[in-house]
């Protein structure tokens, strides 16, 4: 599966599917491709991982929101995250979602995958970083690197948490399963419930000789430089995940994610409005009267535009496709040039004579039609 399919397509649901619809769709697909049902079938195993990856994203509100905004790019797939990219093993999938198979012909547990154990796989906490982007970065997309201080696998025990190879013993409370079973009598008959073992906290083992460096936690504080791609068109406050680049989990669990929060740097010339960019152009009175050409800054450099003779203050010119791309890859914004006329606060004697001559010219006297046009524009603004 060289190219990732749409997650909604993988599960066979619509983009407004509810949590219950997602769960039902995942159960159906997972049972169809379950390794117990398709022994030795590598293609079925890949489909099984694919539906698990899709459900992992769509069942998490934050990840689903990121996916809906950015697609696969917003989940940090290029940085090595996800199931098929090596982020989670088959055992991790069963541990995380195994309870969803209950009542379906015995699927669930670990069956042939893990010797009947249901030990809990811990997950490391997520990290958050704020990344500042210029409009130029946002217009094209950009590769970024951040250096973070985080929990990493202990360099001495390699995450095992023990001082030596035989530093663990099987938990006597749950006998290594990670869960305890309780049977209670009710008016409906005997009811069996399972819960995480309180002694080993779901790990199935007790550390008897903890690592002297990490004190048995399996993690230590370290630093890592993380690279990731930010797609074009992102906006202030948007978030994306880099899978598996958060804190390491204690004793061999699954890493958390790195949550990248987008921050826009103010541009000295351009103002963003959605996918459009606005430039406030100030022209002289003679240019507004006679017309002419002028250069304006754009996201790609400078562009020459034509000012028509008699241009009024507040006129908006549009440069097609000179704005920002849509974050989902469809469509491009425009650049709007808001034309304003500069009125000097003071003038010299020579200019006063020129203006005095203008005052007596009918060309410079406001017309009733011009006043009505301004009135119309204000009414449209108020509606």
UniProtKB/Swiss-Prot annotation:
Q: What is this protein's name? A: Chaperone protein DnaJ
Q: Enumerate the GO terms in the molecular function aspect.
A: ATP binding; heat shock protein binding; unfolded protein binding; zinc ion binding
Self-association and partners:
Homodimer.
Q: Which family does it belong to?
A: Belongs to the DnaJ family.
Zinc finger residue ranges, CR-type: 141-223
Origin organism lineage: Bacteria, Pseudomonadati, Bacteroidota, Bacteroidia, Bacteroidales
Record's GO cellular component, any one? cytoplasm
**What does the entry list as the binding residues for Zn(2+) 2?**
171, 174, 197, 200
- What remark does the entry make about the cofactor? Binds 2 Zn(2+) ions per monomer.
Look up keyword Cytoplasm and say if it applies.
Answer: yes
Source organism (scientific name): Porphyromonas gingivalis (strain ATCC BAA-308 / W83)
Q: Which cofactor does it need?
A: Zn(2+)
- Start-end of the CXXCXGXG motif repeats? 154-161, 171-178, 197-204, 211-218
Could you give the domain comment from the record? The J domain is necessary and sufficient to stimulate DnaK ATPase activity. Zinc center 1 plays an important role in the autonomous, DnaK-independent chaperone activity of DnaJ. Zinc center 2 is essential for interaction with DnaK and for DnaJ activity.
